Amino acid sequence: MSWWWARSLGAQKEFKENGALTSYQSVGLIIGVTGIVGNSLAEILPLPDTPGGPWKVYGVARRPRPAWNTDHPIEYIQCDVASTEDTLAKLSPLTNITHIFYVAWTGSEDCEVNETMFHNVLKAVIPNAPNLRHICIQTGIKHYTGPLDPDGGIQPHDSPFTEDLPRLNAPNFYHNLEDILIEEAAKKKGLTWSVHRPALVFGFSPYSMMNIIGALSVYAVICKHENKPLIYHGAPDNSRDSWNVYADAADADLIAEHQIWAAVDSNAKNEVFNCSNGDVFKWKQMWKILAEQFEVELVGYEDGQKRMSLQERMKGKGPVWDEIVRKHKLLPTKLEDVAQWWFADIVSQSQNLVNGVNKSKENGFLGFRDSKKSFVYWIKKMRAAKIIP
């Protein structure tokens, strides 16, 4: 059974500390280690059976290391990669890096800032790491849909999305990152690259700007605390469609495994790949699971019912969340960190966003996830980390 197949079936190994290794087969640098996929990479890369290993892992993030990330056996580096000076000072000394996993963004659509961040990392690492072999970057399905603003006037591609679809005529920092990656990799002999375009990500990170499971879980927790039903917010003009439409997602661990595959498998070099769990679901199924997990009454889509966005419904709930944190002795967090209402509202307006993943299969990646099980898994992860009760 392959490593990827075993992990898809839940047969992954736990990390066990067996003393410090004196040599490593690979050295990974994760940029954005406290993000939703960076956190998964930090957990999976150091495992004893991870392909390409044993791995030494550096993890880079702008903020101090959070408590929920400290159990990963990595070397944490606090560095603002938007600052050229800070990036050169912190990353240039890392001369043993063999692989870069770039899973960072600014939290805005600003092409220039995101381009600068990526350039800074490459300028610090490539000239100083003679054994650098591969660079992974993560983008996403905005490559096929255009900007997050659903009223932006950009006509998205029809789904299922395939990697050979042309770029849309709209500013998108994904394009900038891809162009920089290909150009810079071509300058160094033997340096390969891969681009990963995941679907909606199911994962865990209180610092992620696009954490759908985090937002929905916090919403359910607040509903339970206030003894109110869990009301599907939907969208004013397409609630029925968003409730019933087929959707897909990509488990954060699966995305990490996908990037590790591309980093070590010759069939994946210098290619672009979509990534998703390999199944589809309807949001009405996920909301039922959400209500069951938090033991709250579900009010789903109903004809004629007035819709209210989560941003509106959760306005002013910061003190309520503070009370919940105190009551259940959770890790101290602010509501705006753990719940991104704007993103949950955008997801509820999304329709027919399905990633085709045949290219990954044809090149040898057979990993998958059951999306319903993945949804529950990440809720349990958040509970175990004391982010939610």
Curated annotation (Swiss-Prot):
PANTHER family membership: 3-OXO-DELTA(4,5)-STEROID 5-BETA-REDUCTASE
Stated role: Iridoid synthase that catalyzes the first step in generation of the iridoid ring scaffold using the linear monoterpene (6E)-8-oxogeranial as substrate. Iridoids comprise a large family of distinctive bicyclic monoterpenes that possess a wide range of pharmacological activities, including anticancer, anti-inflammatory, antifungal and antibacterial activities.
Family recorded in the similarity comment: Belongs to the short-chain dehydrogenases/reductases (SDR) family. Highly divergent.
Listed CDD domains: 5beta-POR_like_SDR_a
Positions annotated to bind substrate: 142, 174, 350
The enzyme's E.C. designation: 1.3.1.122
Residues the entry annotates as binding NADP(+): 34-36, 62-63, 80-81, 104-105, 138, 174, 201, 208-210
Catalytic activity: (S)-8-oxocitronellyl enol + NADP(+) = (6E)-8-oxogeranial + NADPH + H(+); (S)-8-oxocitronellyl enol + NAD(+) = (6E)-8-oxogeranial + NADH + H(+)
Highest taxon listed in the record's lineage: Eukaryota
Name assigned to this protein: (S)-8-oxocitronellyl enol synthase CYC1
Pfam families assigned to the protein according to its UniProt record, in alphabetical order: PRISE
Active site: 142, 174
Keywords: NADP, Oxidoreductase
